[in-house]
């Protein structure tokens, strides 16, 4: 069995993808242009959404959608603390209050039973998070939003390739997908906004490029329209072609990528049943198709004899990468020290979030792995846990 370093992740890039990037470099048009437009069309075909806007990151998209919805001082936005901190940062930077909702103890996603008690007259938005490649139970969450007249924006950073009740995430509602380097499909850095709302899409497209009345690339004139004027002050959040082209080939292979990740993840799950104190996340029982963005386990220190951080350090000694997705937002230094002074008392019951934040560990998972790599990781964990 190889002892070469096995990283936590590696992008699913092949030689054709590399050649496509080189073609863009040779073309003379490397910023936002035809390849960004092609990527948007590819996302539309895959998801079935009505509108797609390519962006420099999903975080940029979150900033813009919060702005368009008018989120600001005095408003509350309900979102999990068990997520990457970008959403919470954007809410905070706009002067609104992030209201942290707890998650299910075993799949680490929130639901209506946890969200509804947190709704107040100040609640202006709900941002639930698809987690690790599994889908939220969307119908119930959208029904809740409609009942209270509160919009829902899906944080779908982990969910490109995931399905809910037979339809790709993005088919309905409004979503933000991440195309960061660690994601199942990557542009190195980037994100995609999808929606069924034409007016919302038009605002996002305008705001992402200085507030101009055209995109960075005018698709009819094959270049920037010289008469373009600023309709409203905007930002510089467009995705360049040199990034967009990288994902085009991956989007053609997304079914293959998802299938390989699924096979590897299920092999992990089979083998880990024999390792005491190590528990993978549960798979939700409602109808959905997991795209296995992450392979997450929980490390029970009482059974394993060591904690999560110690396991990660020991795996590193075995030339195996591992990570944490995520340290709960409300436990991060800034929010630990400033939340109460800025926003008042934090949500009282975040028990499942806090418990899992101390135990979760992400194991290597990427399409270039094989079953022997999975077996190597599980064997290392078993030996570490057995030897304490």
UniProtKB/Swiss-Prot annotation:
Enzyme Commission designation: 2.6.1.87
Pathway assigned in UniProt: Nucleotide-sugar biosynthesis; UDP-4-deoxy-4-formamido-beta-L-arabinose biosynthesis; UDP-4-deoxy-4-formamido-beta-L-arabinose from UDP-alpha-D-glucuronate: step 2/3; Bacterial outer membrane biogenesis; lipopolysaccharide biosynthesis
GO MF annotation list: pyridoxal phosphate binding; UDP-4-amino-4-deoxy-L-arabinose aminotransferase
Keywords, ordered alphabetically: Aminotransferase, Antibiotic resistance, Lipid A biosynthesis, Lipid biosynthesis, Lipid metabolism, Lipopolysaccharide biosynthesis, Pyridoxal phosphate, Transferase
Catalysed reaction equations from the record: UDP-4-amino-4-deoxy-beta-L-arabinose + 2-oxoglutarate = UDP-beta-L-threo-pentopyranos-4-ulose + L-glutamate
Claim: Ribonucleoprotein is one of the keywords in the record: no
Residue(s) carrying N6-(pyridoxal phosphate)lysine: 183
Function: Catalyzes the conversion of UDP-4-keto-arabinose (UDP-Ara4O) to UDP-4-amino-4-deoxy-L-arabinose (UDP-L-Ara4N). The modified arabinose is attached to lipid A and is required for resistance to polymyxin and cationic antimicrobial peptides.
SUBUNIT field: Homodimer.
HAMAP family: ArnB_transfer
Family: Belongs to the DegT/DnrJ/EryC1 family. ArnB subfamily.
Matches recorded under PANTHER family: TRANSAMINASE (PTHR30244), UDP-4-AMINO-4-DEOXY-L-ARABINOSE--OXOGLUTARATE AMINOTRANSFERASE (PTHR30244:SF41)
UniProt name for this protein: UDP-4-amino-4-deoxy-L-arabinose--oxoglutarate aminotransferase
Provenance organism: Shewanella sediminis (strain HAW-EB3)
Gene: arnB
């Amino acid at each position: 069995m190889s002892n070469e370093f096995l990283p936590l992740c590696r992008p699913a890039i092949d030689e054709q993808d590399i050649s496509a990037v080189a073609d863009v470099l040779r073309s003379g048009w490397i910023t936002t242009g035809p390849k960004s437009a092609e990527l948007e069309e590819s996302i539309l075909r895959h998801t079935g959404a009505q509108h797609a806007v390519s962006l420099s990151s999903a975080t940029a998209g979150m900033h813009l959608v919060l702005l368009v919805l008018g989120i600001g001082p005095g408003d509350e936005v309900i979102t999990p603390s068990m997520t990457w901190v970008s959403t919470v940062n954007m809410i905070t930077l706009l002067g609104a209050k992030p209201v942290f909702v707890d998650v299910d103890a075993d799949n680490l996603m929130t639901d209506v039973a946890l969200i509804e008690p947190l709704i107040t007259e100040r609640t202006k938005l709900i941002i639930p998070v698809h987690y690790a490649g599994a889908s939220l139970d969307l119908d119930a969450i959208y029904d809740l939003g409609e009942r209270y007249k509160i919009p829902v924006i899906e944080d779908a950073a982990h969910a490109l390739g995931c399905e809910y009740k037979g339809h790709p995430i993005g088919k309905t509602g409004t979503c933000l997908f991440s195309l960061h380097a660690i994601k199942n499909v990557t542009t190195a850095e980037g994100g995609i906004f999808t929606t069924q709302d034409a007016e919302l899409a038009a605002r996002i497209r305008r705001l992402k490029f200085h507030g101009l009345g055209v995109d960075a690339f005018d698709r009819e004139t094959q270049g920037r329209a010289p008469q373009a004027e600023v309709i409203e002050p905007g930002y510089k959040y467009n995705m360049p072609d040199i990034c967009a082209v990288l994902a085009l080939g991956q989007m053609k292979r997304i079914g293959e990528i998802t299938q390989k990740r699924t096979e590897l993840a299920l092999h992990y799950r089979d083998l880990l049943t024999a390792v005491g104190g190590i528990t993978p996340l549960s798979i939700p029982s409602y109808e959905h198709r997991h795209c296995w963005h992450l392979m997450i386990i929980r490390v029970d220190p009482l059974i394993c004899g060591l904690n999560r951080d110690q396991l990660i350090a020991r795996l590193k000694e075995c030339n195996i990468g591992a990570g944490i997705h995520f340290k709960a937002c409300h436990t991060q230094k800034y929010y630990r020290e400033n939340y109460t002074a800025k926003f008042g008392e934090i949500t009282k019951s975040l028990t499942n979030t806090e418990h899992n934040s101390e135990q979760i560990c992400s194991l290597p998972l990427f399409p270039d792995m094989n079953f022997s790599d999975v077996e190597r990781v599980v064997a290392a964990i078993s030996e570490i846990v057995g030897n304490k």
